[in-house]
């Protein structure tokens, strides 16, 4: 079996103003780092409207299209900009996640990594925010449940920022376990550990600024991995944000590439135990280009090793 890499040139068509941290160079850094890796490269399709309607209302999709500018940028909030190519890029991001689920469920790949932008985990049901437009991972989870007939899907988000959008989109469905580790206090100001969702299927792990890999690993071992194990997911989805890296300029955690490789391996262990190794990972944050590239490669190298039976 192999690891699939899903991406599309359209994702470079989402342009942000000069100096914006969510820039085209992020995707270039990831893809350059993965050059030469033993991956099956797959062209990410556009998401079908019905797939996005599982997590966003039609009026919201229409509003995003309507806000798309003919040139320049349209600001949806102080951080989140549309350019003429942004809508296509956002549809490719969601389409990549959904196609990756189809490939892994069909046995066409052991696992998959979606190298797309813009990211998705801050997009709420009717609100674009935090660089995000559509809930890519949430849409993939709902597709797995409704299209593939799964009963239990786990999402693990180790981006340095709380995955408020993903939580907003999945917490009402008891078939989804959502776990987020994140620095607190930090944008977007959500993700208190006491917030466990209406069905007790939300696990929020708040880490203080300056927390290092030892603290991250201990929190994962204590709070996230046992919950995922007990949930026995038939598929694990990862929101792979690498902005908890010590070199990242937007936050203050102190993780290294080794920590990202470690959590990837531990999640793969759980996937092996419960789902035949089925894992789909989607790129979220990461804003120091060199650290982002190294971290993404460390993450994907573990997926490749596990996908080939290592």
Feature map (PLM): residue ranges:
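HDAC/HDAC-like amidohydrolase catalytic core signature
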Residues: 1-156, 161-310
